[in-house]
């Protein structure tokens, strides 16, 4: 099976060491452009752009990078409860049109109650997934060209529709990750790609089986992807030394403070990540060549594949054998590591060919929209 491999834009910061200002790097537009162009040239299929209060806005970053890239796709966040699904559909179609079909969307329900409260979203875990399901239903239908009336528990819309369709038909694919039962139900019902963080293969196998069974019960099929960091070097010994260096400046207080902050999250996935390392710097190889050191201070994806090119490729194949076809990778610092992955890992992978998109679909000549609702029709001939 050929693999899709994405990279990551570190809009929340970058550097040579975790949890330290030493070796830190200024992340400005010029730097993000360097990473995006490197990923584009090296053959990555796309880049994940993170979301949250610690990040630059993912939609604006993606839009700014369209003119300076050629084939790279942009995986940006949809935030149910923070934005109208109708407006989100319109924005999604516009981004897809401006990028000529290079827009992908990642449904993010959120897991930090403090951050969500600051955004004006005051729903508990169960309610957020209810609202996310309603949001996704409306968003999908509007993007697919339907006029939607919906009266849900959390969201109500009347006459929601889209005048300018996306390039990708019937709409751009939707990605989503979540480990709770509610998240798996949502994935099985409405998304194309279910994402998991980099847990050991045995745990990933269980999650895939659960989501696959739930999707089959609804008459659907779902693809699977995984989010991992990677530390690849010419030798496995060198890679492990690089892993040790990455956390060399972490002290116990920094780790404890980070884990205390993560403990307030109601994200099941975050809880599963924390359980892999227990907040300790020892015994971080939790599965062959799978290292949990990143998660000591980083929320979300907290594990890395560590080794030389053939070794990391072999571990990726183990996940592929479970049904994973998309790998969203990252590494510190992200510019240098993109090149290391391209040069040391890609030669050992069977990659999906990154083909240029089809020619841009022109907007149909129509005149100005009447009253923000109606597209002018050709006058009848009497």
UniProtKB/Swiss-Prot annotation:
One of its GO terms (molecular function) is alkanesulfonate monooxygenase activity. Its EC number is 1.14.14.5. Keywords: Flavoprotein, FMN, Monooxygenase, Oxidoreductase. Pfam families: Bac_luciferase (PF00296). InterPro entries: Alkanesulphonate_mOase_FMN-dep (IPR019911), Luciferase-like_dom (IPR011251), Luciferase-like_sf (IPR036661), SsuD_RutA_monooxygenase (IPR050172). It catalyses: an alkanesulfonate + FMNH2 + O2 = an aldehyde + FMN + sulfite + H2O + 2 H(+). The keyword Cell wall biogenesis/degradation does not apply. It is an enzyme of class 1 (oxidoreductase). One of its GO terms (biological process) is alkanesulfonate catabolic process. Homotetramer. Belongs to the SsuD family. FMNH(2) which is absolutely required for this enzymatic reaction, is provided by SsuE. NCBIfam families: alk_sulf_monoox, PRK00719.1. Catalyzes the desulfonation of aliphatic sulfonates. This is Alkanesulfonate monooxygenase. It comes from Serratia proteamaculans (strain 568).
